[in-house]
């Protein structure tokens, strides 16, 4: 089982895109942008960590690079959750758990 480190910031999807796909495949950012039908600036901002992966971008990258869209979205959500935990940790710590848990089931009689 692969353990995901929780003590350091997760890898930005753009870094993964650059190091694990673009560089080994010999593809430029512009070539990728043209191939998936997005502006060059969008890919450049993702690669440089200034923009996240949207569901639309995940679908496009997945199709072109032959990986699951979930691969890209999971990278992004891990990063987003880590960042928001760091930013809002004090406020989140103040939240008390609900005294009861509500369990619902669908399709019951």
Residue positions per predicted region:
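Short, basic-rich loop-to-helix N-cap that marks the start of a DNA-contacting helix
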Residues: 50-63
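General nucleic-acid-binding
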Residues: 1-2, 91
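A short, Lys/Arg-rich alpha-helix, primarily the initiator
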Residues: 2-27
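The alpha-helix within a helix-turn-helix
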Residues: 22, 33, 62
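Residue-level detection of the helix-turn-helix DNA-binding "recognition helix"
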Residues: 37, 48, 77
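Short, charged recognition helix plus adjacent turn
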Residues: 71-109
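Short alpha-helical DNA-recognition segment
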Residues: 27-45
